[in-house]
C-alpha cells in the first residue's frame, strides 16, 4: 500500500506511522485510539454510574435521584460547568469536521468525537452531579478519562506544532480554529482533572452522615493506589517531629476489625475440628483466602509485566542497530521507551497494591491467631497448664504467630517464584530456542540436593523452636521469682542456666542452621550462572544465528528476573519449613485438652428450689487429665478395672467424692494437712478438672450448682497490674455505698490511708508493691464486691494477722453484720475459730473425703480413730479459743436466708453506716453486670499512664527522632568490627565480579555480531564461568561472614548484656515494669536481632551497590544522565526526609503497643482460674481484642507509610529507565553514538534500578525500624544497676557473720524516690543469738524490715550494722549469701529438688537429704517419686528417677502446693550455715500440726543463731527473747514479751488481747 492510498478516508490507512521517514503518528491511528478509549470508559463509567445511583450509604433524602439544593457549593457548580464546556468544545470540533470544505475527514474521527461527546454528556455529567450527593470521593473513571484527554490533547498540539505547517494531513483536524479548540480542551481537561484529584468535596450533609455513623470515608482510586491519603499525617508528623495523638491515626479498613475477623476465623477452625480435619491451613484460607488471592493476582500481573519488558528491550536495541533502524522512525524508539516506562509504573502500582493487600491479610491472620491462642490459654485444663508453661505460650504469641504472618505476607514468593521461573523460561525459549533445555537440566540436577538440605533445615528448625521456648520459659520464671533470686543471691546460677540454654543450645543450633542454609544458598546461587553458561554455550554451539546484543541483553534481563526468583528459593524453603513447624506447634496447642465443665449441672434456682443444697457432689472422681485422653485405647466394656490400671492413682486428683453438700446460706469448711488436696477441691467445684464416676459404677457422677454466680479467692492471691479500685471492681459497675462497705469489712481502710494514692494506687505486676496480707484482703474484697451467691475461699485467713483475721471473720464471714452472712461459703482453712461456726466440716486426706460432720458432733465423738477429731484437736490453739469469744456471731442456719438483712460495719474512726436489705437488693440488681466502662474502647496504653500519681506505672520509654548513631555503633561493636569489614569487602568483590560478568557478555556478543558468527565459544564460556564462580564464592563468603560470625556474635553479646543488666536491676524496676514488657524485649526484639537484621543489612547494601554501579556506568557513557540523576536524588531525599520521621515513630508505637498484649497474656495465664470462676472470659477476650487492635492499627499505618514512599521512589526508578532510553536515542547519528551492546548493557542495569530502589526503600525502612529493636535492647543493657555484687576492697570474712548481732541506726527507707518513707528512723539493737519476733498490723512494715536487711531496699538515711560491719559497705552477694531467709512468697523453680536447694553445688547429697527430712518434705517427695508428676505422660525421663533429690519440679513449682513450697524454702534455710535467719511468715500456708513440727525444728536447729520472725500468729513469737512492734513503719515497742505484756497500755498487750492470746 502506498503512503497516499486512502482507506476509509484515511490517507495513510490505520497503521501507526505514515511512513518510516516521518517522525509523527498517523492521525487515523490517533482517532482509533481515541474511539476505543471512549468505548472503554463508556462501559466502565456506565457500571460506576449505576453503582453510584444504587448506593444507599447516604442520608435518606439522597437515596433516590437527588435534586439540587438551594445552595450548592460554588466550586462544584463551576466543575459541572467545566464538564458542560468540555462537551461544547467537542461539539465545536464535530461542527468543524462536518462543515469542512478543504479536507474530507475520515469516519473514524467523527465516530471518536461522537463517542467522547456521549461519554461527557451521558456519563461524566450525571456522575459528577451524583457524586456530590452520594460519594465521599471522586470517581476513578473520571480521573483516568481526563488524564488520558490531557495526554492526547498535548500530543495533538505538539504534532501540529512540529508538522502542521509542512503537512496538514498529519494533523487530526486542520486549521487555526482546531488548534484553539485543542488548547481549550487541554486546559479544560486539566481543570476537571485537578478538581477531581485535589479539590472535590461532597455535600456537607453526607460528610456529617459518615462521621455520625463512625465510617471512615474511602478515597478515590488515584489516592488509593498512590497513597495520597497518607499525606496529611506524614506532613503533620514531620512538622511536629512526632505523632501528636496516636489515637487519631487513620483507621485501617473494615477487613481489619480484629473482633469480627477473629470470630469468623474461630468459626472456621471449630468447623475444621468438628469435621475432624484439624487443618489450620484450611481455616486460614477460608477466612483470608479472598484477600490473599486478590493481592496475589496483582503481583502475578506485575511479574508477567516484568517478563514482557525484556521483549520491548529487544525491540528497542534492534531499533538502534544501523541495519534495522531505517524500518521505523525515531519516534518509534520514543514510544518503545515510553512503553517500558508505563510497564514499570503499572508494575509499581500493582506491586504496592499487592503488598498492602497481603499485609492486610497477614495482620488479620496474626490478630486472629493471637486472639485464638489467648482464648485457648484461658480454657486449658490444670494438667495442660502444667505441661505448657507461660513461656511456651508467650513464645507461640511472639514468635510462631509472627512467623505465620510473615509466611502469608511472602506467599507471592512461594507461588510467584515458580510462575516467574516458568514464564521466564518460556520467554527465553522464544529468544534462544532449544538451548534453554540446558538450563532446565541444570535446575533439575539441583533439586534433589536442595531437597535433602531442606529436610535437614526443617529438623533443625523444630529443635530451634524448642530451645527458644526453653529460653523464654527460663526468662519468665526468672522474672516471676526475681525477689527470691535476689534474697538468695542466686543471680549467678540463674544467669548460668539462662546462658546455657541460649548459648550452648539455641545459638549453637542456630549456627548449624546457618551452615546448612549457606550450603543451600550457595547451591541456588550457582544455578543462574550454570543456566546462563549452559544456555548461551549451547546457543553458540548449535545455532546458526550469532549471539548478538539484541539476544544477550534481553536474555540477561530475563536471567536477572530468573536470578531474583531463584535467589528467593532458599529463603522461601526456610520460610516454609519454619512456618510448618510453627503451624504444627500452634495446631498442637489449639487441640490441647481444655476445661469441659459440661458435667456440671448449673441451675438458676426458682423460689421452690431455694431449700435444696446450693452445691451437691455425688459419686465423682476428679482427674488431672480427661479420661478420654488417658483411656483412648480402652473399650467401653472394661469399665473399672482397666480404667484404674490405665489411669493409675497418680492421675487421680480427688477420689470418690460422695455425698458432699453445701446448703444455701451455709458455711462449709474443708480441712486437711499440707498437700491433702484442699485447693484442688475448690478448683474441681469450679469445673477446672475433668471427672469420671466414683466407686459406684452404675451411678453417673453428679455435680450440681444451684446458683447463677460464683466468686473464688485463691490461696495465692492473683492481683492485676492495675489500681486497688480496679482490682476490687473487677469489671463490675461501681457502687460507692457497697464499695465502701466492702473495703471496710475487708479491713482495707487503714491500708488505703497509707497507700500513696489511696484506692487509685497502682499495685504493680502481681501486686508486687503490696504485702502478702494486703494482697489476700484485696483478693477477698474482689470476691465480696462481686455479690455472688456462692463463695469458694481458699485459706484466706492464713496471710493476715490475728486481729485482721478476727475482723474478717466477724464483718465478712459469720458475724451478725457480716456481708456474706447469708451466702453459701466453702472455705478451706485450719482456723478453729471459724470451724466452730461452720455448719459442716469435711476432712480431706490424699485427695479423698475421709470424714465429715459439724464441729460439736465431731468433738463429742468418743471414737479415738476419728481422723477429723484428731485434726481439729491439732489445729486448736490459743488464737482460736480467743477469737471465739470476741466474734459476735449467730449460728448460721437455713432459716436466716430469707430474714431481713441489716449490715453494720463499725470502724473506730468513722460513724456507723447501715444498709438495709431493700437498699442492698437495689445495689444487687445490677451488680453482676460488667461495667460499660470496661467494654468501651479506651485510649492507647501510652495515653493511660497518669504521671500525677505517685505510683504511676512507668511508661515504656520511646525515643524521639532518628535512631542515634551510637545504636548502630553498639550493634557493629557487638558483631565485631573485623567481621563487618570483611563482610563489606566480600560484598564489594561480589559486585565487581558481577559487573565483570556483564562486560564479558557485552564483549562476547559484540564480537559475534561483528563477525556474523559464534566463534571461540569454549573460551568465552570458560571465562564467563570462572568470573561467575568467583562472584558466587564471594557472595557466599559474604553470607557466611554476616550470619556465622557477625550476626550470631552480636546476638549472643546483646542477649547476655541485656539479661545481666535486667537481673542486676533493683526491685523498683520490676515493680514499675510489667513482666510482659520485659519478655517482649527477650522474645520479639531479640528475634528481630537474631533473624531479621542480618538479611536486611545484606539486601540494603547489595541494593545500594547495584544502584551506584548503575549510576556510574550509565553516567560515564551518558554524562547528561548524571544531571538527571542529581535531580532524582533531590526528590528521593525530599520524600525520604518526610517519610523517615513518621515511620520511625510508628515503629516505636508498634513496639510499645505489642508489650501490653504480652503483659495481658502473662497476667491472664497466672489468673485464669479467677477469670474462669467469675465467668469473665468475654471481658478479658474483649480487652485482648482491644490491645491487638491498637497494635494492628499502628502496623497498618506503618505499612501504608512504606507503600507511600515505595510508590514514589519506584516511579523515580521507572523514570531512570525512561531517561536512559531517551538519552540513548539522543546519541543516534552523533559522534558519541553508543554501540547496541553498550545500550543493551546500560538498559539492563537501568531496568534493575527500579528493583534496587524498591529494596533500598524497603530495607532502609526495615533497618530504621528493626534497629529500634537494638535500641530497645541497648536501653535494657544500660538499666541502672543495684549496688555492686562484690566490693573487692571490703569483703567480709568467709564465716561472717560469726555472732549474728544486728543494729539498726536511725534507719529510714522508701520503695521509690517519689514515695513516702516506709520505715522511719528505726533504732534497734539485736544481740547475737537472740530470737526476735516482729509483729504489727498487716502493712505495718514487717516484711519491709527484712527487705532492708537484705538491701533489697537501700537506706535513705541511717545504716544497718551486722557484727560490726555496715552492710552498705559490702557487696550484695557477700551480704545476701551470708544471710538466710524463708520468704513470704515461697518460690520454686523448674528443675529438680536438688537444683532448687543447691544451685551452686555446695552441699553433699547427705546434707541435702537431711535438710529435706528436717523440713518434713520427705513424705511428699517420696509420694511424687513413686508417681508421675500430674499431667506428665513421659515415660523415659521420669522412669529413671529413683532419688527424692531428682524429683522433677514444674515451672513455678506448680506441682507443689503453697505449703509444700514453704517447706522447700525451709530446707534451703536449713542448708545455709548463716548465723542470721529471717522467717517472713514462714508457716502461714501449712496446717497447725506441721507448723508446730516446723517451729520445733527451727528452735532445735537454729538455737545458736539470731532469728527474726515475722508472724501473723503471735503465739509463734511469744517465746521470743524480744518483740519488735511496728506500726506505720516505725518501731513503737521493743522489749521482752513478758515486760510488754506486763504493761497493759502497750500495743503488744492490745494485740495479744484482741487476738485472744492472754487466755
UniProtKB/Swiss-Prot annotation:
Membrane-topology annotation of the record: Multi-pass membrane protein
One GO term describing the cellular component: fungal-type vacuole membrane
Name of the protein: Bile pigment transporter 1
Family (UniProt): Belongs to the ABC transporter superfamily.
One GO MF term: ATP hydrolysis activity
The ABC transmembrane type-1 domain, residue ranges: 292-578, 980-1265
Matching InterPro entries: AAA+_ATPase (IPR003593), ABC1_TM_dom (IPR011527), ABC1_TM_sf (IPR036640), ABC_transporter-like_ATP-bd (IPR003439), ABC_transporter-like_CS (IPR017871), ABC_transporter_C-like (IPR050173), ABCC_6TM_D1 (IPR044746), P-loop_NTPase (IPR027417)
Region (Disordered): 877-899, 1420-1439
Sequence positions that bind ATP 1: 672-679
Binding site for ATP 2: 1336-1343
Subcellular location: Vacuole membrane
Disulfide bond positions: none
Residue intervals on the Cytoplasmic side: 51-84, 128-139, 200-283, 355-410, 456-518, 582-972, 1053-1095, 1139-1209, 1257-1559
Highest taxon in the source lineage: Eukaryota
Sequence positions bearing Phosphoserine: 645, 885, 893, 895, 927, 931
Amino acid at each position: 500500500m502506498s503512503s497516499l492510498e486512502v482507506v476509509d478516508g484515511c490517507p495513510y490507512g490505520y497503521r501507526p506511522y505514515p511512513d518510516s521517514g516521518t517522525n509523527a503518528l498517523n492521525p487515523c491511528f490517533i482517532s482509533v485510539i481515541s474511539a476505543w478509549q471512549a468505548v472503554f470508559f463508556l462501559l466502565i463509567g456506565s457500571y460506576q454510574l449505576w453503582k453510584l445511583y444504587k448506593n444507599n450509604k447516604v442520608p435518606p433524602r439522597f437515596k433516590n435521584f437527588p435534586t439540587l439544593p438551594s445552595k450548592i457549593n460554588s466550586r462544584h457548580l463551576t466543575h459541572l460547568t467545566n464538564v458542560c464546556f468540555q462537551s461544547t468544545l467537542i461539539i465545536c470540533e464535530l461542527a468543524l469536521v462536518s462543515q469542512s470544505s478543504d479536507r474530507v475527514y475520515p469516519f473514524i474521527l467523527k465516530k471518536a468525537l461522537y463517542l467522547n461527546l456521549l461519554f461527557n454528556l451521558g456519563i461524566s455529567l450525571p456522575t459528577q452531579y451524583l457524586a456530590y450527593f452520594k460519594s465521599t470521593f471522586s470517581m476513578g473513571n473520571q480521573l483516568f478519562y481526563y488524564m488520558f484527554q490531557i495526554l492526547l490533547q498535548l500530543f495533538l498540539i505538539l504534532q501540529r506544532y512540529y508538522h502542521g505547517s509542512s503537512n496538514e494531513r498529519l494533523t487530526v483536524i486542520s486549521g487555526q480554529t482546531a488548534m484553539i479548540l485543542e488548547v481549550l480542551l487541554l486546559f479544560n481537561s486539566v481543570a476537571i482533572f485537578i478538581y477531581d484529584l485535589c479539590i472535590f468535596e461532597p455535600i456537607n450533609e453526607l460528610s456529617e452522615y459518615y462521621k455520625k455513623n463512625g465510617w471512615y470515608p474511602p478515597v478515590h482510586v488515584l489516592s488509593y493506589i498512590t497513597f495520597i491519603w497518607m499525606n496529611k499525617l506524614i506532613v503533620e508528623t514531620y512538622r511536629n517531629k512526632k505523632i501528636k495523638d496516636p489515637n487519631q491515626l487513620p483507621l485501617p479498613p473494615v477487613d481489619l476489625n480484629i473482633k469480627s475477623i477473629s470470630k469468623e476465623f474461630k468459626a472456621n477452625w471449630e468447623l475444621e475440628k468438628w469435621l475432624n480435619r484439624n487443618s489450620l491451613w484450611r481455616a486460614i484460607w477460608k477466612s483470608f483466602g479472598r484477600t490473599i488471592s486478590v493481592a496475589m493476582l496483582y503481583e502475578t500481573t506485575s511479574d508477567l509485566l516484568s517478563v514482557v519488558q525484556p521483549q520491548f528491550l529487544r525491540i528497542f536495541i534492534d531499533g538502534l542497530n544501523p541495519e534495522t533502524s531505517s524500518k521505523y522512525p525515531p519516534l518509534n524508539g520514543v514510544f518503545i521507551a515510553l512503553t517500558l516506562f508505563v510497564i514499570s509504573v503499572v508494575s509499581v502500582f500493582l506491586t504496592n497494591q499487592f503488598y498492602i493487600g497481603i499485609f492486610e491479610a497477614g495482620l488479620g491472620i496474626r490478630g486472629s491467631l493471637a486472639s485464638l491462642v489467648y482464648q485457648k490459654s484461658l480454657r486449658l485444663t490444670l494438667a495442660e497448664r502444667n505441661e505448657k508453661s507461660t513461656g511456651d505460650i508467650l513464645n507461640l504469641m511472639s514468635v510462631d504467630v509472627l512467623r505465620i504472618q510473615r509466611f502469608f505476607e511472602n506467599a507471592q514468593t512461594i507461588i510467584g517464584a515458580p510462575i516467574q521461573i516458568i514464564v521466564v523460561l518460556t520467554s527465553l525459549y522464544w529468544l534462544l530456542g532449544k538451548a534453554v533445555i540446558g538450563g532446565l537440566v541444570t535446575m533439575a540436577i539441583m533439586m534433589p540436593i536442595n531437597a535433602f538440605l531442606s529436610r535437614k533445615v526443617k529438623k533443625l528448625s523444630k529443635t530451634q523452636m524448642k530451645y527458644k521456648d526453653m529460653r523464654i520459659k527460663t526468662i519468665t520464671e526468672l522474672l516471676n521469682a526475681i525477689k527470691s533470686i535476689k534474697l538468695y543471691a542466686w543471680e549467678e546460677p540463674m544467669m548460668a542456666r539462662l546462658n546455657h540454654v541460649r548459648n550452648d543450645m539455641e545459638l549453637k543450633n542456630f549456627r548449624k542452621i546457618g551452615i546448612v542454609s549457606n550450603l543451600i544458598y550457595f547451591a541456588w546461587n550457582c544455578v543462574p550462572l550454570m543456566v546462563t553458561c549452559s544456555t548461551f554455550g549451547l546457543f553458540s554451539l548449535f545455532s546458526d544465528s550469532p549471539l548478538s546484543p539484541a539476544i544477550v541483553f534481553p536474555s540477561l534481563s530475563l536471567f536477572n528476573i530468573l536470578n531474583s526468583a531463584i535467589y528467593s528459593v532458599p529463603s522461601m524453603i526456610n520460610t516454609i519449613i519454619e512456618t510448618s513447624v510453627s503451624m504444627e506447634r500452634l495446631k498442637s496447642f489449639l487441640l490441647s485438652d481444655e476445661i469441659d465443665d459440661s458435667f456440671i449441672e448449673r441451675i438458676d434456682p426458682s423460689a421452690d428450689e431455694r431449700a435444696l443444697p446450693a452445691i451437691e457432689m455425688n459419686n465423682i472422681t476428679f482427674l488431672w487429665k480427661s479420661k478420654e485422653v488417658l483411656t483412648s485405647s480402652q473399650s467401653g466394656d472394661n469399665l473399672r478395672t482397666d480404667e484404674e490400671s490405665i489411669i493409675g492413682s497418680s492421675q487421680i486428683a480427688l477420689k470418690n467424692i460422695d455425698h458432699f453438700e453445701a446448703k444455701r446460706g451455709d458455711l462449709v469448711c474443708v480441712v486437711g494437712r499440707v498437700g491433702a488436696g484442699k485447693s484442688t477441691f475448690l478448683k474441681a467445684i469450679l469445673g477446672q478438672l475433668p471427672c469420671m464416676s466414683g466407686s459406684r459404677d452404675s451411678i453417673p457422677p453428679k455435680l450440681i450448682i444451684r446458683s447463677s454466680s460464683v466468686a473464688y479467692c485463691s490461696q495465692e492471691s492473683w492481683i492485676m497490674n492495675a489500681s486497688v479500685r480496679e482490682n476490687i471492681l473487677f469489671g463490675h459497675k461501681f457502687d460507692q455505698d457497697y464499695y465502701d462497705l466492702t473495703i471496710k469489712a475487708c479491713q482495707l481502710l487503714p491500708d488505703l490511708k497509707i497507700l500513696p494514692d489511696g484506692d487509685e494506687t497502682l499495685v504493680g505486676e502481681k501486686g508486687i508493691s503490696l504485702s502478702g496480707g494486703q494482697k489476700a484482703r484485696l483478693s477477698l474484697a474482689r470476691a465480696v464486691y462481686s455479690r455472688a451467691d456462692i463463695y469458694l475461699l481458699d485459706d484466706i485467713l492464713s496471710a493476715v494477722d490475728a486481729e485482721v483475721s478476727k475482723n474478717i471473720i466477724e464483718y465478712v464471714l459469720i458475724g451478725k453484720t457480716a456481708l456474706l452472712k447469708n451466702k453459701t461459703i466453702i472455705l478451706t482453712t485450719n482456723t478453729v475459730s471459724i470451724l466452730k461456726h461452720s455448719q459442716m466440716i469435711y476432712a480431706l486426706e490424699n485427695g479423698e473425703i475421709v470424714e465429715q460432720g459439724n464441729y460439736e458432733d465431731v468433738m463429742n465423738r468418743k471414737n479415738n480413730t476419728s481422723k477429723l477429731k484428731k485434726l481439729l484437736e491439732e489445729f486448736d490453739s490459743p488464737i482460736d479459743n480467743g477469737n471465739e469469744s470476741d466474734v459476735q456471731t449467730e449460728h448460721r442456719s437455713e432459716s436466716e436466708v430469707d430474714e431481713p438483712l441489716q449490715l453494720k460495719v463499725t470502724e473506730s474512726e468513722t460513724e456507723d453506716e447501715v444498709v438495709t436489705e431493700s437498699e442492698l437488693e437495689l445495689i444487687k440488681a445490677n451488680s453482676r453486670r460488667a461495667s460499660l466502662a470496661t467494654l468501651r474502647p479506651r485510649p492507647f496504653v501510652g495515653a493511660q499512664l497518669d504521671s500525677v500519681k505517685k505510683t504511676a506505672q512507668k511508661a515504656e520509654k520511646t525515643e524521639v527522632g532518628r535512631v542515634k548513631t551510637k545504636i548502630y555503633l553498639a550493634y557493629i561493636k557487638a558483631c565485631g568490627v573485623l567481621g563487618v569489614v570483611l563482610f563489606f569487602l566480600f560484598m564489594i568483590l561480589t559486585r565487581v565480579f558481577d559487573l565483570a560478568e556483564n562486560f564479558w557478555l557485552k564483549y562476547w556478543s559484540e564480537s559475534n555480531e561483528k563477525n556474523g558468527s559464534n566463534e571461540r565459544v569454549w573460551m568465552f564460556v570458560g571465562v564467563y564461568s570462572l568470573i561467575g564462580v568467583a562472584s558466587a564464592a564471594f557472595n557466599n563468603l559474604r553470607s557466611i561472614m554476616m550470619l556465622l560470625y557477625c550476626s550470631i556474635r552480636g546476638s549472643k553479646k546483646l542477649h547476655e548484656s541485656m539479661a545481666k543488666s535486667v537481673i542486676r536491676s533493683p526491685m523498683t524496676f520490676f515493680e514499675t515494669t510489667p513482666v510482659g514488657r520485659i519478655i517482649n524485649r527477650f522474645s520479639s526484639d531479640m528475634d528481630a536481632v537474631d533473624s531479621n537484621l542480618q538479611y536486611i543489612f545484606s539486601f540494603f547494601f547489595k541494593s545500594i551497590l547495584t544502584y551506584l554501579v548503575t549510576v556510574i556506568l550509565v553516567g560515564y557513557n551518558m554524562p547528561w544522565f548524571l544531571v538527571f540523576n542529581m535531580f532524582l536524588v533531590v526528590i528521593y531525599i525530599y520524600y525520604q526526609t518526610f517519610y523517615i520521621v513518621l515511620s520511625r515513630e510508628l515503629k516505636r508505637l508498634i513496639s510499645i503497643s505489642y508489650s501490653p498484649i504480652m503483659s495481658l497474656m502473662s497476667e491472664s495465664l497466672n489468673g485464669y482460674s479467677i477469670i474462669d470462676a467469675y465467668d469473665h472470659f468475654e471481658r478479658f477476650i474483649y480487652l485482648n481484642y482491644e490491645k491487638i487492635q491498637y497494635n494492628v492499627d499502628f502496623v497498618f499505618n506503618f505499612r501504608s507509610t512504606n507503600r507511600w514512599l515505595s510508590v514514589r521512589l519506584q516511579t523515580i526508578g521507572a523514570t531512570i529507565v525512561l531517561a536512559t532510553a531517551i538519552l540513548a536515542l539522543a546519541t543516534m547519528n552523533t559522534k558519541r553514538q553508543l554501540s547496541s551492546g553498550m545500550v543493551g548493557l546500560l538498559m539492563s542495569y537501568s531496568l534493575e534500578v527500579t528493583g534496587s530502589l524498591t529494596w533500598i526503600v524497603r530495607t532502609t525502612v526495615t533497618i530504621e525500624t528493626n534497629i529500634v529493636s537494638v535500641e530497645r535492647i541497648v536501653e535494657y543493657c544500660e538499666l541502672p544497676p543495684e549496688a555492686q555484687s562484690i566490693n573487692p576492697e571490703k569483703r567480709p570474712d568467709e564465716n561472717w557473720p560469726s555472732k549474728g548481732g544486728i543494729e539498726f541506726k536511725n534507719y529510714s527507707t522508701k520503695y521509690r524516690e517519689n514515695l513516702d518513707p516506709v520505715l522511719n528512723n528505726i533504732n534497734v539493737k539485736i544481740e547475737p543469738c537472740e530470737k526476735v519476733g516482729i509483729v504489727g498490723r498487716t502493712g505495718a512494715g514487717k516484711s519491709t524490715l527484712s527487705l532492708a536487711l537484705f538491701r533489697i531496699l537501700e537506706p535513705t538515711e541511717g545504716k544497718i550494722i551486722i557484727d560490726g560491719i555496715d552492710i552498705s559497705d559490702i557487696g550484695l552477694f557477700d551480704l545476701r549469701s551470708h544471710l538466710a531467709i524463708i520468704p513470704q512468697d515461697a518460690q520454686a523453680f523448674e528443675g529438680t529438688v536438688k537444683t532448687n536447694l543447691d544451685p551452686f553445688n555446695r552441699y553433699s547429697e547427705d546434707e541435702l537429704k537431711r535438710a529435706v527430712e528436717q523440713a518434713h518434705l520427705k513424705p511428699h517427695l517420696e509420694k511424687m517419686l513413686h508417681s508421675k508428676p500430674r499431667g506428665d505422660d513421659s515415660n523415659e525421663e521420669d522412669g529413671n528417677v529413683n532419688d527424692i533429690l531428682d524429683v522433677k519440679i514444674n515451672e513455678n513449682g506448680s506441682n507443689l502446693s503453697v505449703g509444700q513450697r514453704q517447706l522447700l524454702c525451709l530446707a534451703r534455710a536449713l542448708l545455709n550455715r548463716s548465723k542470721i535467719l529471717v522467717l517472713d511468715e514462714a508457716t502461714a500456708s501449712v496446717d497447725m500440726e506441721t507448723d508446730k513440727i516446723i517451729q520445733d525444728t527451727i528452735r532445735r536447729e537454729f538455737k545458736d543463731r539470731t532469728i527474726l520472725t515475722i508472724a501473723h500468729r503471735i503465739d509463734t513469737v511469744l517465746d521470743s527473747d524480744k518483740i519488735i512492734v511496728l506500726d506505720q513503719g516505725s518501731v513503737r515497742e521493743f522489749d521482752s514479751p513478758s515486760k510488754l505484756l506486763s504493761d497493759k497500755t502497750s500495743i503488744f498487750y492490745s494485740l495479744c488481747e484482741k487476738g485472744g492470746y492472754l487466755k
